[in-house]
Regions:
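Small/polar (Gly/Ser/Thr/Ala-rich) solvent-exposed segments
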Residues: 1-15
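Hydrophobic, Leu/Ile/Phe/Ala-enriched alpha-helical segments that form helix-helix packing faces
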Residues: 1, 89, 119-126, 154, ...
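PAPS-dependent sulfotransferases, especially Golgi type II membrane carbohydrate sulfotransferases
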Residues: 157-248
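PAPS-dependent sulfotransferase catalytic domain
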Residues: 13-161, 181
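Generic structural motif recognizing short loop/turn segments at the entrances and edges of beta-strands
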Residues: 4-5, 130-131, 191
Length: 248
């Protein structure tokens, strides 16, 4: 941290998991060659002692990142209903990258297991009383004050939080690639928090069966059946993490 700034790092959990971790948590384990490891360095650019890096192998660290680094951060987990996450993968990545439920990597992306595995590791590896924080996208949309509460908890200035903004001008969007236009269409056209993206947007709990029927019309029976199976499999992990989410 320098000049009063706090570094913020955002990444999908599965992208930092060890291949071994992924293989062990898939219904059908996959072979892997080795576990890559990112080595921590001192401020002078020298590698830390081997004994310190060996801790990564002995403490159950499920990621390729050094335990020393993970213990220096405040972990924040953002969760959302699996039905909304997994369908969005097809809706957004399908047209832009050809994503399909039968892709080899889809079972890895369409899972909340990596969040749960990493949450549990952080919870057991608490240092100086720092506990992992869980934010539910639904709660953030319905109760924006949760973000202000988070800022206070992290000792950040809550007045810097924005709930409204100007849409991206069409002139800028026109200069973007088709991928960017499609992938960022929602956020770029918005002017604030979109409550219609809430899982209970109509004031009712998410009706998964009704949503499945809609999917059938868009993606067909076979793809929908596979998509629904991923959602059902992820629900226990989602409900587990919901138990720890930050609330007002």
């Amino acid at each position: 941290m320098g000049q009063g700034k706090t570094p913020f790092i955002k990444e999908h959990a599965f992208t930092i998991m060890k291949p071994e971790t992924i293989s062990q948590n898939l219904t059908h384990p996959r072979p892997y060659i080795n576990n890559p490891r990112i080595t921590a360095q001192t401020a002078k650019g020298q590698e830390v002692a081997a004994a310190e890096t060996d801790d990564d192998e002995n403490d159950g660290n499920p990621t390729v990142l050094p335990t020393q680094f993970l213990r220096s951060i405040t972990p924040i987990f953002l969760i959302r209903h699996p039905a909304l996450i997994f369908e969005s993968i097809l809706r957004v990545s399908g047209p832009t990258m050809g994503a399909h439920v039968d892709d080899e990597e889809f079972p890895v992306e369409a899972s909340l297991r990596w969040l749960r595995v990493l949450y549990d590791w952080f919870a057991k590896s608490t240092v100086n009383g720092v506990r992992p924080i869980v934010l539910n996208a639904d709660e953030i949309m319905a109760h924006p004050k949760i973000v202000q509460q988070l800022c206070e908890q992290l000792q950040l200035d809550p007045t810097g939080v924005r709930f409204e903004w100007n849409p991206v001008p069409p002139s800028i969007i026109e200069g973007q690639s088709s991928y960017q236009q499609h992938f960022f269409s929602t956020i770029q056209s918005s002017c604030g928090v979109r409550l219609d993206k809430h899982s209970a947007a109509q004031g009712q709990e998410l009706d998964l069966d009704a949503m499945t029927t809609t999917w059938q019309e868009v993606y067909g029976l076979e793809t929908t059946a596979t998509l629904r199976s991923f959602v059902d499999a992820a629900m226990p992990d989602y409900e587990y993490l919901c138990h720890y989410e930050l609330r007002l």
